Each structure stands twice: as C-alpha cells, then as structure tokens.
C-alpha cells in the first residue's frame, strides 16, 4: 500500500507544479530589479573583488612565503 500512496502523492505534486507554472506563464509580468540590474550588479561585484585582490596581492607588500627553496639553509646535525 505504501508505494501506491507514494506514487499518488508524487503525481499530485507534479500536477500542482505544472499547473502553477502554466498559471504563471499566462500572466504578464513586469521586470523587477533583478531582471533589470541583476547581471550588471553581478559583473560589477566580480570586477570589484578581482581588482581589490589583485591590488592586495601585488601592491600592499605582504610577504606570502610561497616557497622556502633557496632561502632556508639546513642546520648541522648534532649527535647527542
């Protein structure tokens, strides 16, 4: 009996989603803020982040310590 109930509920959900989508597609919708400016806001935010991190990485003078090769000399081994 459980699979039968589960199948019936799935069909109800699919039909209600399809009806909702059909209902929404018939309505004329005016573009909202995200439709008008969403891509521009996303692009400007990405550009701002890239420019800021590029400046920080190249101009601020942070010592990143990427590789110690050539800068570190090994110590002599001491036998105790």
Swiss-Prot record:
Disulfide bonds: none annotated. GO terms for biological process: central nervous system development; mitochondrial electron transport, cytochrome c to oxygen. Residues 1-24 form a transit peptide. Residues 25-32 are mitochondrial matrix. SUPFAM superfamilies: Mitochondrial cytochrome c oxidase subunit VIIb (SSF81423). It is found in: Mitochondrion inner membrane. Pathway: Energy metabolism; oxidative phosphorylation. The chain crosses the membrane at residues 33-59. Keywords: Membrane, Mitochondrion, Mitochondrion inner membrane, Transit peptide, Transmembrane, Transmembrane helix. Component of the cytochrome c oxidase (complex IV, CIV), a multisubunit enzyme composed of 14 subunits. The complex is composed of a catalytic core of 3 subunits MT-CO1, MT-CO2 and MT-CO3, encoded in the mitochondrial DNA, and 11 supernumerary subunits COX4I, COX5A, COX5B, COX6A, COX6B, COX6C, COX7A, COX7B, COX7C, COX8 and NDUFA4, which are encoded in the nuclear genome. Component of the cytochrome c oxidase, the last enzyme in the mitochondrial electron transport chain which drives oxidative phosphorylation. The respiratory chain contains 3 multisubunit complexes succinate dehydrogenase (complex II, CII), ubiquinol-cytochrome c oxidoreductase (cytochrome b-c1 complex, complex III, CIII) and cytochrome c oxidase (complex IV, CIV), that cooperate to transfer electrons derived from NADH and succinate to molecular oxygen, creating an electrochemical gradient over the inner membrane that drives transmembrane transport and the ATP synthase. Belongs to the cytochrome c oxidase VIIb family. This is Cytochrome c oxidase subunit 7B, mitochondrial. It comes from Pongo abelii. The lineage of its organism: Eukaryota, Metazoa, Chordata, Craniata, Vertebrata. The gene is COX7B.
